[in-house]
Amino acid sequence: MSSVESSPISRYEDEVFPLSFSNVAFEPPMLSHSPDRSTYADDFSQSYQQELLTFPLSYPIVDESECTHTKDKTDSNIITSTEDDCMFDMEFNGNAASAVAAASKESNSASGFAFASNDAFANVAQQNYRLWLSSV
């Protein structure tokens, strides 16, 4: 008796859910039309690298009149050039000795300034935020 009851149900299931192994019967799913993940990642990284080459990240321009000179109490916070080279390995075409000297001179002059007012700090922070927002 159970075989008699199951036959109408199985016919109904075959009509509602036809079993087919051919690709001609159905259109491919929508996800098959999406871009390949690897090419999308490559395109994104190439556009990001091009953006960095075109608009390199820069330090905010600060007027020296808005800053006051402060004495450097300790050099422990300053990253040495060898640590910096290990963390940020980049292709460099030029004289490494002159680049290290220029970087140390720049870091010494930049670390010796503090903002004279909160408004000067807020202006630089707002400029950095706008730069970040334009890149997002």
UniProtKB/Swiss-Prot annotation:
- What membrane topology was assigned to this protein in its record? Peripheral membrane protein
- Tell me the superkingdom of the source: Eukaryota
Gene knockout outcome: Reduces the autophagy flux induced by nitrogen starvation as well as the flux of the cytoplasm-to-vacuole targeting (cvt) pathway.
Keyword flag Membrane = yes
Its Gene Ontology cellular component terms are: phagophore assembly site membrane
Q: Where is this region: ATG9-binding?
A: 127-136
**Induction (record text):** Expression is dramatically increased under nitrogen starvation conditions and is regulated by the transcription factor GCN4.
Q: Name one GO biological process term.
A: autophagy of mitochondrion
**Where in the cell?**
Preautophagosomal structure membrane
Query: Which keywords appear in this protein's UniProt record, sorted alphabetically?
Result: Autophagy, Membrane
What's the chief localization of this chain? membrane
Its annotated function is as follows: Involved in both selective and non-selective autophagy. Does not appear to play a role in determining the size of autophagosomes, but rather influences their formation rate. With ATG9, plays a role in the delivery of donor membrane to expanding phagophore.
Query: What other note does the entry give for this protein?
Result: Present with 450 molecules/cell in log phase SD medium.
Domain comment, in the record's words?
The C-terminal 10 residues are required for the association with ATG9.
Q: How does it assemble?
A: Interacts with ATG9.
What is the protein name stated in its UniProt record? Answer: Autophagy-related protein 41
